[in-house]
Design a protein with these regions (language model features):
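Register position in tetratricopeptide repeats
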Residues: 73-74, 110, 144-145, 177, ...
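Alpha-helical segment of the N-proximal tetratricopeptide repeat
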Residues: 59-93, 99, 106-110, 177
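Conserved structural position within tetratricopeptide repeats
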Residues: 89-92, 122-126, 157-163, 193-197, ...
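Helix-start (N-cap) detector for alpha-helical repeat units in TPR-like alpha-solenoids
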Residues: 61, 95-99, 132-133, 165-169, ...
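Canonical tetratricopeptide repeat
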Residues: 66, 99-103, 137, 170-174, ...
Length: 316
C-alpha cells in the first residue's frame, strides 16, 4: 500500500510556530494563598525561558515533520516513522498531531503491522471521528487481521456518514469482499450494484459482480457478464483470467485455453497464467503443451515442487 503524504500537515505544522505574547501584567501567587500581585522581573524572566523553550520545540517539530514527509517521498518508511515519533515527542499537544498519527498508521498498514495501525487509526478517530480515510484504513487493518465484524462496523459507520464518492466506493469494495468471504453473495451483489451506480465504468466492480452471480448459482449469467466485459475490454488481463477460470469450472477447457492464450500475450511474465493453461491442456490431454506451460511457469520463478502434482499427470 502506498503511503500518502498529507499536504495538510505542512500547513498545520506551521501553526506550531505561532505564539501569542503573554500580555497579562498581573499574576496570582498560589504559594501565597492566591494573592494577586504585580509581575516582577523574575516572572518575566521565567516567561522568557518558557517562550524560548516552546519556540525551540516548535522549530524541531516542524523540522521533524518536513524530514518525515521527505522520507515518505523516498519510500523510506522506517526513517519517516522515527521522525514522526520524534515530532510527537517534541510537541505532544500540537493540534496537527492527529495527522501525524494518521501517517504513522498508514506506514504500519503498508508494512503489514496491522495491530499497530489499528492503534494509531483509533487514536485519530477518537479525536476526529470524521476522518473517513482513517476509518477506512482501520477497516482494512481489521480485515487483514481476520476481524471481519469490526471491519464491517467501520464500513457501516463510514457509509452512513456521507463520505466522498471515492471513499464510498472503496468502502463498498471492502464490504463486498467481506460479504463474499462470508458466503453472502447477495449482499456483495448489492454492494457492487451501488458501486456501479456511482461509477458505471468501474472494471473491478463488473468483475466482482460476475463472481457474485456465480456464487449465487447463476453461472451462465456470470459468463454472459464476462463475455460482455471481455468484448468491451479485450486487453484487460483480469477479465480474460476470470472468464478462463469460470470456463474451467463449467468444464469447457477448450474455451479456457483461448482466454489463457490471449491473457499470456498481454502478460507473458505472469506464471499463474501458464499454470492455468497447463491445467486446461491437461484436461484436453494435450500433454506436450501442458509440459511446456509448466516448464514456462518454473522458468518464471515457480518452484517445481509446487507443480509436482501436474507433472505427475503427464505420466498417466
Amino acid at each position: 500500500m502506498k503511503v500518502f503524504k498529507n499536504v495538510a500537515l505542512v500547513g498545520l505544522c506551521l501553526f506550531a510556530l505561532s505564539f501569542t505574547s503573554l500580555r497579562a501584567q498581573i499574576v496570582i501567587d498560589l504559594k501565597r494563598g492566591g494573592v494577586v500581585r504585580a509581575k516582577t522581573i523574575d516572572d518575566y524572566r521565567e516567561e522568557a525561558k518558557v517562550k524560548e523553550r516552546l519556540a525551540a520545540d516548535s522549530l524541531a517539530y516542524v523540522d521533524h515533520l518536513t524530514r518525515a514527509l521527505n522520507a515518505l517521498g523516498r519510500d523510506s518508511l522506517a526513517q519517516a516513522e522515527q521522525l514522526f515519533k520524534e515530532a510527537l515527542r517534541v510537541r505532544p499537544e500540537a493540534p496537527s498531531n492527529y495527522i501525524v498519527r494518521h501517517n504513522l498508521g498508514e506506514i504500519y498498514l503498508a508494512q503489514g503491522r496491522y495491530r499497530e495501525a489499528i492503534t494509531r487509526f483509533s487514536e485519530v478517530l477518537k479525536e476526529h471521528p470524521e476522518v473517513g480515510e482513517a476509518r477506512y484504513e482501520r477497516a482494512v487493518s481489521y480485515y487483514e487481521m481476520g476481524n471481519q465484524q469490526a471491519a464491517l462496523e467501520d464500513c457501516s459507520v463510514l457509509l452512513n456518514g456521507n463520505p466522498a464518492t471515492h471513499l464510498r466506493v472503496k468502502a463498498l469494495f471492502l464490504q463486498a469482499g467481506i460479504h463474499m468471504k462470508s458466503r453472502q453473495p447477495h449482499l456483495a451483489k448489492t454492494d457492487v450494484e451501488e458501486i456501479l451506480r456511482l461509477d458505471p465504468d468501474n472494471q473491478n466492480a463488473h468483475l466482482l459482480e460476475a463472481g457474485a452471480l456465480e456464487a449465487l448459482g447463476q453461472s451462465q449469467n456470470a459468463l454472459h457478464k464476462l463475455d460482455a466485459f471481455v468484448e468491451a475490454h479485450p486487453e484487460n488481463v483480469e477479465g480474460r483470467l476470470a472468464r478462463a477460470e469460470l470456463e474451467m469450472r463449467l468444464t469447457v477447457p477448450d474455451l479456457a485455453v483461448k482466454d489463457y492464450d490471449a491473457a499470456i500475450l498481454l502478460a507473458p511474465e505472469n506464471p499463474e497464467l501458464f499454470i492455468g493453461r497447463a491445467k486446461a491442456n491437461l484436461q484436453l490431454k494435450r500433454f506436450v503443451a501442458a509440459r511446456k506451460d509448466l516448464d514456462a511457469a518454473v522458468a518464471l520463478g515457480i518452484p517445481r515442487g509446487m507443480l509436482n502434482a501436474y507433472y505427475q499427470q503427464l505420466k498417466k
